[in-house]
């Protein structure tokens, strides 16, 4: 047999080194990860056999077998699944790193639990937690039988298995256990781990144990001894024939015999087929943890009857997966079965992208068994299955009844809820009820839009909100002044996804949603309106002068009653970008620059130099307090220095070149500047 030696991909070598050289107490998770991989292999061959039954000819018994060997210190696990070709062994077990390899190493370095390894797609390597050498023998219907082996020293060997015992189809994995890990050869330990972590695996798991039994056999030696004694002391005695047979039958002895016995470790039927009333929370947790390393946050177990019959169990995890929003991520959180036969874990129509964190099982009685992935997406019955979204929303509302649980949920999955508000028009009103924000009246707690509406004055028709980079920044915004004075509540939106969601939501419970950093009409009394119009007329000349000085930096300058503590502020137009959105778009490398084009410079003339400088300074400070950035910080600094000089009565007969530049330079305007106003 000729062997080929390959080097592990660099990231995989680093991962193996990390696993081998770091001390972890929870090593038993290796068995869960390997059994999960074997179960996936069985799913794949079962699915292929739906369209081509001949795929199972080499072995129709789909199962997982575990065999401990104390004498040789090996633990063997095998399946009758799809098996691996030579290329599969080379690529999947060494030369091509999974997308999660790097992320998992970073998580481990940061102190994450080793139990998370399966969530990053690298569960196979958990074998090296307990083994110093791993041998994999695999046979695919599409190739010869091959052996993969490595002691994780940076390389692995792949050999065609011409001399070994044919395994038919599937994969056999032999773990050569470290001296300190031989407890995993004990029958009781294996049973304990499988029951705790893999009890609800769909396929039977058999444990093969060598047991010593006592057996009664005829004792030939005893009969010979008795005959010799009879010769020495002959005695004539008539014995009944039946009695003689009985005497001979007692001439036996007990011997010890070693025999391998098998025992099924997971006899429990699929949990989703049982009555929810008969299932304990511990059983749900055990089922969930066959594919995760920690408990779930919430579960929904239900059945649907009528046009389509199906059962489903849906789980909300405790935390978001590392690759939640990766565009190329394989969606494998919901497994679809038809009459307990696994069909696919990639039914993209089964659940919307914003719910991709939901895990579970859907088992239909009505879909055809031979359904392919392609026809699955076209089949109109799948549209009916989408009512699982409604059940999921019910689950979210149940979580919301417990403040502590909902806080955990919202912390992990608020981005998904906001994505749903943005993308799912049909369920947008229901999702909006799940949104939570801090506000001017909520203190340290968050508030829902529903609670906001209940606190609104009867005549009030608007829900006000402000967007910004942080809670601290928006709490000190000058835009809040008048609204606070009028006792109007304002929501604080500080997540980049908030503004996207609000632009789609537009209103809630018949109340219009308004961003106070943009141009809007403030509710006012007739007397307030009269005072505002009088002041606008009085300061019309000043506003016009400021417009002339600022030129194309602004659309217009207006007298505002929306400010109290600040002399001025920058607002964008109703349909333009807010300061927060401009900041977000600037951070995107491939942003659309057409919306943030700047106006060309326009020189100003005929104005007093000091007035111009102070006006520029007011404009720039307004940019800062309104959440924008200053494009020419050196010019801003020059104007500050000049203002300090004036305050100290320092004579400036001549301007420095920096000051001249500060007077004449025109800073770039914020996004969507054609809709911009100065209050």
Swiss-Prot record:
<dbReference type="InterPro" id="IPR020575">
    <property type="entry name" value="Hsp90_N"/>
</dbReference>
<feature type="binding site">
    <location>
        <position position="373"/>
    </location>
    <ligand>
        <name>ATP</name>
    </ligand>
</feature>
<dbReference type="GO" id="GO:0051082">
    <property type="term" value="F:unfolded protein binding"/>
</dbReference>
<feature type="region of interest" description="Disordered">
    <location>
        <begin position="654"/>
        <end position="679"/>
    </location>
</feature>
<feature type="binding site">
    <location>
        <position position="37"/>
    </location>
    <ligand>
        <name>ATP</name>
    </ligand>
</feature>
<feature type="region of interest" description="Disordered">
    <location>
        <begin position="216"/>
        <end position="250"/>
    </location>
</feature>
<dbReference type="InterPro" id="IPR001404">
    <property type="entry name" value="Hsp90_fam"/>
</dbReference>
<comment type="subunit">
    <text>Homodimer.</text>
</comment>
<keyword id="KW-0346">Stress response</keyword>
<comment type="similarity">
    <text>Belongs to the heat shock protein 90 family.</text>
</comment>
<keyword id="KW-0963">Cytoplasm</keyword>
<dbReference type="GO" id="GO:0005524">
    <property type="term" value="F:ATP binding"/>
</dbReference>
<feature type="short sequence motif" description="TPR repeat-binding">
    <location>
        <begin position="675"/>
        <end position="679"/>
    </location>
</feature>
<dbReference type="GO" id="GO:0016887">
    <property type="term" value="F:ATP hydrolysis activity"/>
</dbReference>
<dbReference type="Pfam" id="PF02518">
    <property type="entry name" value="HATPase_c"/>
</dbReference>
<feature type="region of interest" description="Disordered">
    <location>
        <begin position="589"/>
        <end position="609"/>
    </location>
</feature>
<dbReference type="InterPro" id="IPR036890">
    <property type="entry name" value="HATPase_C_sf"/>
</dbReference>
<keyword id="KW-0067">ATP-binding</keyword>
<dbReference type="GO" id="GO:0005737">
    <property type="term" value="C:cytoplasm"/>
</dbReference>
<dbReference type="InterPro" id="IPR020568">
    <property type="entry name" value="Ribosomal_Su5_D2-typ_SF"/>
</dbReference>
<protein>
    <recommendedName>
        <fullName>Heat shock protein 82</fullName>
    </recommendedName>
</protein>
<keyword id="KW-0143">Chaperone</keyword>
<feature type="binding site">
    <location>
        <position position="124"/>
    </location>
    <ligand>
        <name>ATP</name>
    </ligand>
</feature>
<comment type="function">
    <text>Molecular chaperone that promotes the maturation, structural maintenance and proper regulation of specific target proteins involved for instance in cell cycle control and signal transduction. Undergoes a functional cycle that is linked to its ATPase activity. This cycle probably induces conformational changes in the client proteins, thereby causing their activation. Interacts dynamically with various co-chaperones that modulate its substrate recognition, ATPase cycle and chaperone function.</text>
</comment>
<dbReference type="GO" id="GO:0140662">
    <property type="term" value="F:ATP-dependent protein folding chaperone"/>
</dbReference>
<dbReference type="InterPro" id="IPR037196">
    <property type="entry name" value="HSP90_C"/>
</dbReference>
<feature type="compositionally biased region" description="Acidic residues">
    <location>
        <begin position="217"/>
        <end position="228"/>
    </location>
</feature>
<dbReference type="InterPro" id="IPR019805">
    <property type="entry name" value="Heat_shock_protein_90_CS"/>
</dbReference>
<keyword id="KW-0547">Nucleotide-binding</keyword>
<dbReference type="Pfam" id="PF00183">
    <property type="entry name" value="HSP90"/>
</dbReference>
<feature type="binding site">
    <location>
        <position position="79"/>
    </location>
    <ligand>
        <name>ATP</name>
    </ligand>
</feature>
